[in-house]
From Swiss-Prot:
Stretches of the chain found on the membrane's Cytoplasmic side: 99-176
Glycosylation sites: N52
Membrane topology: Single-pass type I membrane protein
Protein name per its UniProtKB record: Membrane protein FAM174
Superkingdom: Eukaryota
Organism annotation: Xenopus laevis (African clawed frog)
GO cellular component term, pick one: membrane
Cysteines engaged in disulfide bonds, as pairs: none
Region (Disordered): 41-71
Transmembrane segments: 78-98
Residue numbers on the Extracellular membrane side: 32-77
Similarity remark: Belongs to the FAM174 family.
Keywords: Glycoprotein, Membrane, Signal, Transmembrane, Transmembrane helix
Gene: fam174
Length: 176
């Protein structure tokens, strides 16, 4: 097993290559039968002529070469191995695509989370009030806001800090 539970392509390819090599090696010990002689002239016609009996009995014209190659089993086996290897590669990539798609759905469950917060600009909600106060302004660095605002506000659990645009003033809004 490879990283993230995937079977590496090298190990699958290596196994299929070993299978292909073993199929060729195992064919080396097998004997291939010679093509069977077939009469050039049908036996019924040869008996009627009588003088051409030497060609029917085994002369140079007596055998017709077979249309099938003696390497047919080896070729078929190589083709089967090639098809199986191609199918294994296709299945591997399909499973990999499905797994990555499932992982992407899990990460997108709550929306886009990998954006850079420094580049994000938040605008205040439209309100009927004529206040310039915003509850949060992402354009100001956190280092300016954090210590100064915390030191200026009383330490009660129910308060909200609002920041006036363009300034570093902190105003505490009390929530009761």
């Amino acid at each position: 097993m490879g990283v993230d539970g995937y079977v590496s392509l090298c190990s699958v390819g290596g196994m299929l290559l070993a299978l292909l090599a073993s199929s060729f090696i195992s064919d080396g010990g097998c004997s291939v039968d010679a093509p069977t002689p077939s009469p050039a002239i049908p036996t019924g016609l040869a008996s009627k002529k009588g003088s051409n009996s030497s060609t029917v009995d085994g002369g140079p014209l007596a055998t017709v070469p077979s249309a099938t190659s003696p390497n047919t089993p080896r070729t078929q086996r190589a083709l089967v191995v090639l098809v199986l290897f191609s199918a294994a590669v296709v299945i591997y990539f399909v499973i990999r695509a499905v797994r990555t798609r499932i992982k992407n759905k899990k990460t997108r469950k709550y929306g886009v989370l990998d954006t850079n917060l420094g580049n994000m600009e938040l605008t205040p909600l439209e309100q009927d009030d004529d206040d310039d106060d915003t509850l949060f302004d992402s354009n100001q660095p956190r280092s300016q806001l954090s210590l100064a605002c915390i030191l200026q506000t009383p330490q009660f659990p129910a308060h909200v800090i609002s920041i006036r645009k363009g300034t570093s003033q902190c105003n505490a809004l009390w929530v009761m």
